[in-house]
Amino acid sequence: MAKEKFNRTKPHVNIGTIGHVDHGKTTLSAAISAVLSLKGLAEMKDYDNIDNAPEEKERGITIATSHIEYETENRHYAHVDCPGHADYVKNMITGAAQMDGAILVVSAADGPMPQTREHILLSRQVGVPHIVVFLNKQDMVDDQELLELVEMEVRELLSAYEFPGDDTPIVAGSALRALEEAKAGNVGEWGEKVLKLMAEVDAYIPTPERDTEKTFLMPVEDVFSIAGRGTVVTGRIERGVVKVGDEVEIVGIRPTQKTTVTGVEMFRKELEKGEAGDNVGVLLRGTKKEEVERGMVLCKPGSITPHKKFEGEIYVLSKEEGGRHTPFFTNYRPQFYVRTTDVTGSITLPEGVEMVMPGDNVKITVELISPVALELGTKFAIREGGRTVGAGVVSNIIE
């Protein structure tokens, strides 16, 4: 059989495996790469290679993550797998590996377990938009009714966290059996189940919108006044596109202002437009230098609003990661570093939570002293005197 050509023109999607410890996330990751390698769509990665995940630092937090890549007939995937539960929590909260969708691995022999629930909840909180389920270890379950029962439990659990449980694709199989078959050089009955899973992922997880197609947003890093030309605001465009003549809003810290872009520059050259990822200077009509400061954002009018009060899901750095050595309580007042600036805020812990220890993850309510442009999924760091003590993501906006 002729191998298909590996091409880079397919749409790109980021996914990852989530689920309870020992339910087979890493084995499934290895099985997917092994089965697809037989079709010339991936390089085979063995279990140990994925399991010995290198440690990476993301905003000072140590996270062990394995990245593998593979293709299906329709897409190119970047796939992340984490060895430990704590690594998943950190990964999802910091957005170190942004996921467009996830494969939830549940052992058919055990059914949903505490971390199954926690990963679904985290997916909801941090905005992983779509989940496909793989019921693993099917070879260990003789009773078809038991399999159906586990499937029902998983659907109920997904629905409880506002995922469409009834419509979620669920594929049963055995990652280990598929991996063994693939290592022997063939796609057998178990390998077919892995291919079926990937066909569901292809069909169910939509291709994400490209950053350039989203609404324009640029965090303000610096502001200059250029004689005879006006005020230039510099920063890296987070998403969208900005062109000369566009109306933009300046949001955060002070009342929102509207203005018009009269120039876009990169490396002192005039551009027709700046797009996501570009470091640019944007010239603003009639805006005074003192009206704009670091920590504000330039955006498409009406696309993002300033807020002071929100709920967030946070991970608190352990002492070993350079975090606090002691717990904190309600009314703790650190700085919240959002995009390009620190804003002081006070924390309220959930009812029944007395204190938060270094190394914990928890949901908090925050009230900032000045409003910042926020939306669901905005990432922030929690700092004390310039040192990072936590990381979080906005899960709900209150006011």
From Swiss-Prot:
It is found in: Cytoplasm. Pfam families: GTP_EFTU, GTP_EFTU_D2, GTP_EFTU_D3. Residues 81-84 are annotated as: G3. Mg(2+) binds at T26. Keywords: Cytoplasm, Elongation factor, GTP-binding, Hydrolase, Magnesium, Metal-binding, Nucleotide-binding, Protein biosynthesis. GTP binds at residues 19-26, 81-85, 136-139. Residues 174-176 are annotated as: G5. The keyword Metal-binding applies. GO terms for cellular component: cytoplasm. InterPro entries: EF-Tu_GTP-bd (IPR041709), EF-Tu_GTPase (IPR050055), EFTu-like_2 (IPR004161), EFTU_2 (IPR033720), G_TR_CS (IPR031157), P-loop_NTPase (IPR027417), Small_GTP-bd (IPR005225), T_Tr_GTP-bd_dom (IPR000795). Residues 136-139 are annotated as: G4. Residues 10-209 form the tr-type G domain. Belongs to the TRAFAC class translation factor GTPase superfamily. Classic translation factor GTPase family. EF-Tu/EF-1A subfamily. Monomer. This is Elongation factor Tu. It comes from Helicobacter pylori (strain ATCC 700392 / 26695).
